[in-house]
Amino acid sequence: MDMLTLWNLEREDMEKILEDSIYFKKNRYGHDILKNKNIALIFESPSTRTRMSFDLAVNELGGHSMVMNENEIHLGKKESIKDTAKVMSRFVDVIVARVKSHKTLEDLAFYGTVPVINALSDLSHPCQVLADLLTIKENGKDFKNLKLAYFGDGNNVSNSLMIAGAILGMNIFIATPRSYEPNGIFVKKALEIIAKYGEGSLTLTDDPIEASKNADVLYTDVWISMSDKNKDLEDVKRIFPKFQINSKLLSNAKKDAMVLHCLPANRGMEITDEVIDSKQSKVFDQAENRLHVQKAVLKYVLKDK
């Protein structure tokens, strides 16, 4: 069983992953779920939180992790992804990959015979968003009809937030400049899931005030990701500032609204120091929760093994 996006999860699957995450957070050590199992951790781009949290997760579950960076593995260069996937499947029990192109993940999953986990791709960031959900849940907020407003670039995080929100019956607002909307395939999938469950909603807007009004959660991410080579910095500086999460925007939300950012943050750009360091900010709890969620994800993909 792979974890490439969230849209293959049923609501009960997502709830079980969050339930297991809470258990692992309360009981961090002493597990042997991954005893005698080897987990490949592939990184095509630099990583701090993802690498540390997955490496620790594997080891704290009793497994062995093997980290390979871009210059240490022939991923479509000198060797086809097909052959790499087939060979790695002979050695390891799970492949965790942070890749530049989502197609790389799909090929690893198609040609390999072991579960593949998306640690980040250009289209989707499921493990991050599961950690976001855990952060929301542990702060006592009910997902059903919760209003989550995302501000900035319609990127991989916003894509995954739409899917997660649809599955759990949330009201998701994605506020982006025009031409920076989230991926159309993910929008379509989210709307299909909303129709399936008959709960929740998805609103795309270029008005951050509308999105922030009475919001339970305000969320942002960097305006320019590491993989964004086509964005003009001056254009971003001109178009994006009104989507910054600052005290003025936060004042439109509910008084007990929480603020999330998946980090790393460009302080003073997408979010101010005042907000990210405030009591309403849960970004460092959110970062820690990557560890606990990823343990639950590893357990989930191996449940039929």
From Swiss-Prot:
The keyword Kinase does not apply. It is found in: Cytoplasm. L-ornithine binds at N156, D221, S225, M226. It is an enzyme of class 2 (transferase). Carbamoyl phosphate binds at S47, T48, R49, T50, R98, H125, P126, C127, Q128, C262, L263, R290. The keyword Disulfide bond does not apply. Belongs to the aspartate/ornithine carbamoyltransferase superfamily. OTCase family. Its EC number is 2.1.3.3. Keywords: Amino-acid biosynthesis, Arginine biosynthesis, Cytoplasm, Transferase. Signal peptide: none annotated. The lineage of its organism: Archaea, Methanobacteriati, Methanobacteriota, Methanomada group, Methanococci. It catalyses: carbamoyl phosphate + L-ornithine = L-citrulline + phosphate + H(+). GO terms for molecular function: amino acid binding; ornithine carbamoyltransferase activity. Pathway: Amino-acid biosynthesis; L-arginine biosynthesis; L-arginine from L-ornithine and carbamoyl phosphate: step 1/3. GO terms for biological process: arginine biosynthetic process via ornithine; citrulline biosynthetic process; L-arginine biosynthetic process. Reversibly catalyzes the transfer of the carbamoyl group from carbamoyl phosphate (CP) to the N(epsilon) atom of ornithine (ORN) to produce L-citrulline. This is Ornithine carbamoyltransferase. The gene is argF. Coiled coil: none annotated. GO terms for cellular component: cytoplasm. HAMAP family: OTCase (MF_01109).
